[in-house]
């Protein structure tokens, strides 16, 4: 990675996910202080960070503040009755993130978004509980200090309590001013994403200390625009229309621009496996404003053609496993 010019490594959550199925996802954490034993130990993770640093590569840790896994040891004896939202009973989130910024939204609509659960196996944590809020803040600070992290990626950022996010981001940036933190706010509306960036000062007075967010709008525009005919609102105009809204961001140059990620179809697949368009997308990504992020396997044209199954999208990198016909580390079997 260092030879290819990468300066940071972002791993999906490496903490314990003690579940009977789909544990490869990593987002249903069952112990916030322990690396999943299938990966190794806390010490081996810290050594990985140190080894990467010696090569000029920093480590970005994927953190989950909104929910945990239903197999977390908390579930056996909750610290308090309000540790989870909705009386610890599954009530699905609406995923309508816009309600948090909508001046016309009903309070119940906002609550259903932020207090609802993703799925029944991911209890939604109540950060309005001061003990839980302190726990999550201290846990984040501990991992930065213990492992020597250079950055944090926060999953499902806007789903957590807004007041808590203000305090969490304040504490993190106060303690580590040079630590970059990127939040996941999956919206194709730049204004919705910009609400969370430090310095935005929206009309409702919300204060955020979050330095960076993922630019989902630009990724979507590239994936669609490069394969479309030019029209009033299609083709390359999609990309222009997104960039033309940069004024809503306090710092568009600190947004993370990305080719694709583990939650969506790979760009190579989305572009019909056309190498010319894929190269064009990468060239744009690496030269436009923002911090570029590339998913593993992009360099060997990994694809999920014909399926949106996340297990396929997140397939193992070829090589290093017994029986692999292709080895992308050595070049064996590659076309």
Give each language-model segment a name.
Residues 30-34, 259-270:
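Short, basic, glycine/proline-bearing loop/turn elements
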């Amino acid at each position: 990675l260092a030879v290819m010019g990468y300066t940071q490594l972002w791993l999906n959550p490496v903490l314990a996910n003690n579940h009977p199925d789909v544990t490869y996802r990593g987002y249903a954490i069952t112990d916030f202080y322990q690396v999943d034993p299938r990966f190794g130990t806390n010490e081996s993770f810290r050594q990985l960070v140190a080894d990467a640093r010696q090569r000029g590569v920093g480590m970005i840790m994927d953190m989950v503040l909104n929910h945990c896994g239903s197999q977390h040891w908390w579930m056996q004896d909750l610290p308090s009755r309000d540790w989870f939202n909705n009386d610890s009973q599954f009530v699905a989130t609406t995923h309508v993130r816009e309600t948090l910024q909508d001046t016309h939204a009903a309070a119940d609509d906002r609550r259903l978004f932020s207090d609802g659960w993703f799925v029944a196996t991911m209890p939604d944590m109540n950060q309005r509980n001061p003990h839980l809020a302190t726990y999550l803040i201290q846990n984040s600070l501990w991992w930065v200090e213990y492992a020597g992290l250079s950055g944090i990626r926060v999953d499902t950022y806007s789903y957590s309590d807004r007041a808590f996010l203000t305090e969490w981001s304040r504490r993190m940036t106060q303690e580590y001013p040079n630590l970059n933190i990127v939040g996941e706010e999956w919206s194709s509306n730049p204004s919705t994403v910009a609400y969370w960036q430090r310095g935005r000062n929206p009309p409702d007075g919300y204060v955020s200390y979050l330095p960076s967010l993922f630019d989902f709008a630009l990724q979507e525009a590239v994936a669609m625009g490069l394969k479309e005919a030019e029209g009033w609102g299609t083709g390359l105009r999609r990309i222009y229309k997104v960039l033309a809204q940069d004024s809503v961001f306090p710092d568009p140059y600190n947004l993370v621009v990305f080719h694709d990620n583990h939650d969506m179809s790979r760009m190579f697949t989305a572009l019909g496996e056309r190498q010319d368009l894929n190269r064009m997308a990468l060239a744009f990504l690496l030269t436009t404003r923002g911090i570029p992020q590339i998913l593993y396997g992009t360099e060997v044209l990994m694809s999920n053609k014909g399926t949106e199954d996340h297990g396929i999208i997140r397939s193992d990198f070829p090589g290093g496993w017994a029986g692999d016909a292709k080895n992308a580390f050595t070049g064996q079997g590659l076309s």
